[in-house]
């Protein structure tokens, strides 16, 4: 399995984002609104309205941080970051098994990312589960950590048992277009790959 886990945000940056998001409770809506036909049947979470000021402002911050990070640039060869949104899952919420759409209105999705805005000790459950033909791995990230993986991987988020899981998700259109070539590139050594 090919993926990158990297510390993208520090504690101060996380707290600034969370403070902004907490200002606008009315802007959180049913996550099914942006899901594809299959994903909408298995998606049970909340997401921040992409047109809200809090979403626009903090999406720009995340976009800038990703594009300026050398480890991420070396791993993903990003042409464009798109579809950024903030989601949260509280008790009993989850996101069933699905594959991200390869083409979205905002761009091509070669790589998917999840950026954690909550330290893992503040919630139970809520593991990101990534599957390939040969393996399945579960991830619970620390606050500020980002995981990047091929959008073609089957993945899900297990039910949150306690607490609240707050993340930022989005997609990367890479300069490496072909799936086969992308996989070849992703197997090249990178200091942050695990």
Predicted regions located by residue number:
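Short amphipathic
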Residues: 3-9
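Generic detection of short hydrophobic beta-strand segments and adjacent strand-loop junctions
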Residues: 7, 46-48, 139
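A short, well-structured alpha-helix characteristic of acyl/acetyltransferase catalytic modules
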Residues: 14-24, 29
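Signature of the catalytic double-stranded beta-helix
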Residues: 20, 35-105
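Conserved small/polar residues in nucleotide/adenosyl-binding loops
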Residues: 184-190
């Amino acid at each position: 399995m090919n993926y990158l886990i990297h510390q993208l945000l520090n504690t101060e940056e996380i707290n600034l984002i969370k403070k902004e998001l907490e200002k606008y409770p009315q802007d959180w809506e049913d996550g099914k609104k942006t899901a594809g036909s299959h994903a909408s049947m298995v998606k049970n979470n909340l997401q921040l309205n992409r047109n809200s000021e809090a979403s626009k402002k903090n999406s720009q911050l995340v976009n800038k941080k990703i594009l300026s990070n050398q480890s991420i640039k070396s791993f993903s060869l990003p042409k464009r970051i798109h579809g950024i949104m903030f989601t949260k899952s509280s008790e009993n919420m989850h996101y069933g098994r699905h594959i991200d759409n390869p083409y979205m209105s905002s761009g091509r999705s070669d790589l998917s990312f999840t950026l954690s805005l909550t330290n893992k000790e503040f919630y139970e459950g809520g593991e990101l589960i990534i599957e390939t033909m040969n393996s399945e791995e579960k991830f619970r990230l620390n606050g500020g950590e980002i995981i990047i993986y091929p959008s073609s991987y089957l993945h899900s988020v297990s039910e949150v048992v306690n607490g609240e899981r707050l993340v930022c998700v989005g997609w990367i259109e890479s300069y490496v277009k072909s799936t086969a070539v992308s996989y070849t590139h992703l197997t090249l050594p990178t200091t942050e790959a695990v």
